[in-house]
Amino acid sequence: MPHIIFLTFLYVGGKKLETIKKNEVKTGKVIDLTHEGHGVVKVDRYPIFIPNALIDEEIKFKLIKVKKNFAIGKLIEVISESDDRVTPPCIYYAKCGGCQLQHMTYRAQLDMKREQVVNLFHRKGPFENTVIKETIGMVNPWRYRNKSQIPVGQSNSNQVIMGFYRQRSHDIIDMDSCLIQDRQHQEVMNRVKYWLNELNISIYNEKTKTGLIRHLVVRTGYHTDEMMVIFVTNGATFKQSELLVNKLKKEFPNITSIKQNINNSHSNVIMGRQSMTLYGKDKIEDQLSEVIYHISDLSFYQINSSQTEKLYQQALNYAQLTGKEIVLDTYCGIGTIGLYMAPLAKHVYGVEVVPQAIKDAEDNATKNQLKNTTFECGKAEDVILTWKSQGIKPDVVMVDPPRKGCDETFLTTLLKLNPKRIVYISCNPSTQQRDAQILAEQYELVEITPVDMFPQTTHIETVALFVRKDEE
C-alpha cells in the first residue's frame, strides 16, 4: 500500500508558490515571536511556529503539524544563535510544561512581555497614545512561587511519582527539583514522595478514578516563613494521615498548618470545596507592606509575593490617594489590594462573589485594625448600584478580575458610577484590551505598566490607569 503524503499548497495573490509537507526539514530565519514565545519563520508569508527559537536566529526545523493557515515546527539545530540565547538551567526544561522561556535571557523575557502589551494596545483600538512602561522585573527571577500544586501519580512499576505535567498533557514528569518553586516546597515534595512509597498509600488514578492521593499543595508566607501542607484526596477516609502529619512536623518545624482537602470530582479541578485541619492552624499568615493577611488553603493570594508588592505599589501610584478618597475594590477576594490601600484612603469598599473570601477579608481588616473598610458579598454590578443609591460615590475604583476579564454588565454599571480614576489590574492583557474599548467611551487609557509575576513563563500581568475624560 503506497504512503499517503499530505501537502499544503501556499497561495499568495492567487498564485501557487510552494508546497509544505509534514515531516519535511527546512531552514529559515526567525523574524518574530508569538505570545507563547514561539519563533516565527515565514515561507512565502505562510507562518511556521517553532518553540525554543529566538528572533534573528537561523535555524533548522522539522514540520510536525501542517494546517491550512499555519504550521508547527520542531527545532532541530540553531545554525546561528541569538545573543539572547542561554542554556536552560533546569534539567527538566525540555519536557516540563511549567516554563517556556528558560532558553532566553531575563532581559529579553521582559522586553518580549512588554512587546506583547504594545502589540495588543497600540495596534488595535483607540490606544495608540497610551504610554506603555518597561516591564517591572525581579532581581532574582527564580524560586519565587509561594504556592506549589504538585500532581501525584504512579509509574509503571507502581512507584509514586511527583512533579509537573509534560507540555500540553497530563503526563506527570517525576521530578526532585523545580527552579521556580520555593526551595522548601521541593524538600517537602521529596520527603512526602518517599513516605507515600514507604507507607504504601494508594495514589489516585485519573483513568480509573480510584486511589486516594491526588495532589500535594504547599503554601508559604513569604515574609513569615509559615508553611501549610495540603493533601488533596479522593474521599474523606485518610487512615495514615496521622503518620504523615507526625513525620512532617518532625522534619519541617516551620509547618504551622497541615490540611486535608477532599476532591471527589472527576475533573481537572485541583481543589475541592471541603477541607479539614489535621494539625495546627486553619490559616497561615503573610505580610505585604504593613498589612498582615490570613491565607487558607482555598484563598486566592498572588503567587509571587515580592512582585505583588511592586504591582500593588504601582496601582497605589496610579490611584494617587491623599487620604480623602473613597476607594471601591471590585473582585476584592480576601481584601489584599483594598487593605493595602486602606491606610491611605478615607474609606475602602470591597465586593466579591465568594462568601468565604469576604469573611477572610473582614477577618484581615480586623487583624490589621483597619476600621475604614466595608466588605460585602455579591455580584459587583449589583452591590455597587446599591452603594450608589446609598450616596456612596467612589473617587477611585480598583478592578482585578479573573483571566476572562470583566462582565460587560459590570463595565456598563461602572460607567454609570463615573469615578475619577479606574485602576485595572489584569492577568490577561487580551481581555483587558477588550474591556478597555468599552471604558474608552468615558475614560482615557493613560498608562499601562507590565509586571513580571511569573519569570521563565510567557505569563504577563499589567496594571492600567484610566482617567475620566473631563478630569484630564
Where are these regions (language model features)?
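Short, acidic/hydrophobic/Gly-rich beta-strand patch recurrent on exposed beta strands
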Residues: 39-44, 163-166, 230-232, 361
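Extended interfacial segments that mediate partner engagement and assembly in macromolecular machines
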Residues: 76-88, 97-203, 223, 238
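Short, aliphatic-rich beta-strand segments
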Residues: 218, 225-234, 292-296, 396
